Amino acid sequence: GDLDSWRDAWTTIFIKRKMYDLLACAMDSFGSILMQFTQFEGFVWHLGGKTSGTGKSLTLSAKAGVWGHPVRYRTGKGTSPVAMQNRAGMLNSMPLLIDEITSTQRDNMEWAPGFIFNHTEGQGKERMESSANKERINDTNWHSTVTMTSNEVLTDYMAGARKFSSNGELRRFLEWTPNVPLQWTSQELEAVRALKLHFGVAGEAFIRWVVRNQSTTRRLVEETYDQLRNEMGFSGDERYWNAGTATTVAASILTSRQYSKIIDVPVLNIIDSLKDKVNRSRAVIRNSIRTAEDVLNAYTRDNYGGFIVLKRQPNGETAASWGDGSMFSGPVIRSKILGRVEFEVTKEGYVDYFIEEQLLKEHCVGMSYGYSDFKVELSKNYVVTVVKKDMLARTKGPLLRVNALHICRKKTHEAEDSLPVEPTET
């Protein structure tokens, strides 16, 4: 192929159609080799969504065609994680492209978060030599970006369905989820077909120019990084977004006729597209932040059937039942008791809430939330104490005193079977 034909195809497909979201993702293919001019080893793009024909595969083909064959350059869904790391090491600064991680992610929902974290660390895993008690020399490293496609929306899983905290991984990748099928004219279809005939030429021209102009490249990447940090308001924990967007924008500038003369792209539109993706990710993180109350409510929701519920009856006596509504009777094993709720038992108009500390600590660990932080945060708004509580008191059961977290709230008109924690007036 030749560079002019490649340029015409990109111009017809991306620029004339004003497909700036797709173009921004595609320009990251040039930006990948600029990652070594930042302080970071890697960045991740994910193209997701269940709708077909929206441009995910086209974007991957366009990115692959910058450096090699649009199809054979990228790895397939059957590639093992170790092989992917080896490929990233061999490509070094060229982008790693992974097509269809849907089945891999569904088989192991923790695969993608782990992969995102590992790739942005820039180094393969350490291994031992099979014939000696010593480590192998680990020369599998990289400074590059990776782009993955799937039918999933990773931010939905990592910000909601995932039980563990995902803030670190969420801030190391950006996601594009197109949902409008693309329609093509005959001329545009010819341009799409041309991508499979003219490939590998743009990347070669770009890397040759970068090698000859490293000081100019480094200066522009650093300036772009600083400008985007100010323009997009990147904070310290958003540094990977800053690096990933900076390399893409810098590549969009360096490929212009003012520098390497490869292709002129609308830089401002690309910046707007990147800004939109960053703002979407910020919104996801903002809405997914877990508070101590969220952790407590999650414990209640998952375990309320194992709570002992005591309610004061009209005659002044108390009646005990399980949270699922079944009556409390006969001997009970300790492991079945997951909490205790007392409705107006000790004080009229108040509900007392007890959970064994050991169980609550295990729950906090499972949700990646420090127990000490949990108590401190909860104490900012509610009266929280640690007491020695007989979890079977007033049930005719044996003595069962444990260290328990005690929360007291005012009873409201809400249903008694729900346990929203509300500020307690003191």
Located regions from the model:
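Alpha-helix N-cap/helix-initiation motif
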Residues: 15-23, 48-52, 83-87, 102-105, ...
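P-loop NTPase catalytic core of nucleic-acid-dependent motor ATPases
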Residues: 1-72, 245
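Acidic/polar loop patches that form or flank catalytic/metal-binding clefts of enzymes
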Residues: 40-44, 70-76, 124-130, 154-159, ...
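Short, glycine/acidic-rich hinge or "gate" loops at secondary-structure transitions
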Residues: 39-56, 60, 128-141, 164-165, ...
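AAA+/P-loop NTPase substrate/partner-engagement loops
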Residues: 46, 58-109
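Extended alpha-helical interface modules used as scaffolds for assembling large macromolecular complexes
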Residues: 88, 94-95, 104-107, 111-123, ...
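Conserved beta-strand scaffold positions in the cores of enzyme catalytic domains, especially
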Residues: 44, 71-72, 146, 173-175
